[in-house]
UniProtKB/Swiss-Prot annotation:
Location(s), subcellular: Secreted
Keyword vocabulary terms for this entry: Lectin, Secreted
Stretches assigned to coiled coil: none
Protein name: Alpha-(1-6)-linked fucose-specific lectin
Gene Ontology cellular component terms for the protein in this record: extracellular region
Record note on quaternary structure: Homohexamer.
Note: Metal ions are not required for the saccharide-binding activity.
Naturally occurring in which organism (per UniProt): Rhizopus stolonifer
Species classification: Eukaryota, Fungi, Fungi incertae sedis, Mucoromycota, Mucoromycotina
Function of the protein: Alpha-(1-6)-linked L-fucose specific lectin.
């Protein structure tokens, strides 16, 4: 199950946190 309009998956190597870059553009 993938979120809608996932452009890319941003992974932070420091926190190992992956956030999907959605259309929302939260910038989180």
């Amino acid at each position: 199950i993938d979120p809608v309009n996932v452009k890319k998956l941003q992974c932070d190597g420091d926190t190992y946190k992956c956030t999907a870059d959605l259309d929302f553009g939260d910038g989180r």
